[in-house]
Amino acid sequence: MGKPSILVVEDNPLSRATAVDMFKNLGFTVLDAYNGHHALALLEARPEISLMFVDVRMPGISGLELAKVAHKRRPNIKIILTSGYVGEDVVPSGVNFVPKPWRMEQVAQAVCGSKL
């Protein structure tokens, strides 16, 4: 079996590149999207995606909206939400949250908590 595939969804190019590198270092095959619409297109086209790492605050479709749509389309997909502006209190129960700035230990713990 190949490496697990993750979809990083982040509108900030620098943050997106940082997250991509971080997940590659954790052994993932990484795809990235610059907004929610792009993420949904990739999710539809790439059935191997098993985990999403999603910024909560994005223009257009927010991370919370994206998580809801993704779960409707792919009920078994695991989602980790992230933000530097909101706290865990806005994150739905059962969804992992990692605050920005990211620490590798927190991200690794959230991934393990996602039960891939």
Residue ranges and their predicted role:
Residues W102-K115:
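C-terminal output helix
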Residues A17-N25:
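Charged docking surfaces used in two-component/phosphorelay signaling
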